[in-house]
Design a protein with these regions (language model features):
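A short glycine-rich, Lys/Arg-flanked "PGG" loop and its adjoining helix->strand segment in the class I
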Residues: 137-149
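Short conserved loop adjoining the S-adenosyl-L-methionine
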Residues: 110-116
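C-terminal alpha-helical "lid/dimerization" subdomain adjacent to the S-adenosyl-L-methionine
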Residues: 156-212
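Short catalytic micro-motifs in class I SAM-dependent methyltransferases
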Residues: 126-127
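Conserved class I S-adenosyl-L-methionine
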Residues: 2-50
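A conserved beta-strand element that flanks and buttresses the S-adenosyl-L-methionine
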Residues: 123
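Core SAM-dependent methyltransferase catalytic element
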Residues: 216-235
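Class I SAM-dependent methyltransferase SAM/SAH-binding core
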Residues: 56, 63-110
Length: 235
């Protein structure tokens, strides 16, 4: 199906998305970013929550991580938010759950400030590091306001190892990517994206920002090289 969507007649934006999406699928399938470990951690968290629970997925992409982790659980509703419309189309096509699912084409930062609803689970994976530092802090405050009293934030993201700068962290990540089973062209695409768009913070920064939002955290996942983390955060 995808080869038809990425046909040369497709609009450039659509074709570019599916080129990147296929690269992402290769990264996931080869576990380059430890998606299996992250998926296992997410599943444990979701299984521990009393049913039924509502989920808001900020920066959901194609929702594949959430859909898999929520499979078979008693979910009351799922809302995915992303700025990339083709990703949402893929999410809708791949969803076969029995619970109510809605996808919103919106900026994840703006959405959380305008939605008039609280959620039992708000999750975000590999999205926050694209934001400037001050926006990260304000975003976490807004997220905390939209949790039910018993709700939790599930945060998966890249981070800077202790005493490493953003540039040193990006370079360390790229050194690992050099061994990924993807083409040289794809590695170049990833590198350009990371240098221009990735702004990971230290764990200390993230911890302080969560505390300022009134949230405490428990670690559910940590990357073998300290470049990624997973938290469950509650009031």
């Amino acid at each position: 199906m995808l080869d038809h969507i990425t046909d040369v007649m497709a609009p450039p934006g659509i074709a570019a998305f599916f080129q990147g999406w296929q690269l992402y699928q290769s990264v996931v399938q080869n576990n380059c970013m430890e998606h299996r470990e992250i998926g296992t951690a997410l599943r444990r968290v979701f299984e521990s929550i009393d049913p039924e629970f509502s989920v808001l997925d900020l920066g959901c992409g194609d929702s594949s991580m959430a859909i898999k982790a929520l499979e078979g659980l008693r979910v009351s509703s799922y809302t995915g938010v992303d700025l990339t419309a083709p990703a949402l189309d893929v999410a809708r096509a791949n969803f076969h759950g029995t619970y109510s699912a809605t996808w919103m084409h919106a900026n994840m930062v703006d959405y959380i400030t305008t939605v008039d609803q609280q959620f039992d689970v708000i999750m975000t994976s590999f999205a926050m590091h694209h934001l400037p530092a001050d926006i990260k802090k304000a975003w976490l405050v807004d997220i905390a306001k939209h949790l039910t009293p018993w709700g939790c934030l599930v945060l998966i993201d890249t981070c800077c190892p202790a005493d490493m700068s953003r540039d040193e962290t990006v370079q360390m990540y790229l050194d690992l990517i050099a061994d990924w089973p993807v083409s040289t062209e794809d590695k170049t695409i990833i590198a350009k994206h990371m240098w221009s768009s990735d702004f990971p913070e230290s764990e200390a920064f993230i911890n302080d920002a969560l505390a300022a939002a009134g949230l405490s955290h428990t670690t559910i996942y940590h990357h073998q090289h300290g470049l990624q983390l997973g938290y469950v955060c509650r009031r």
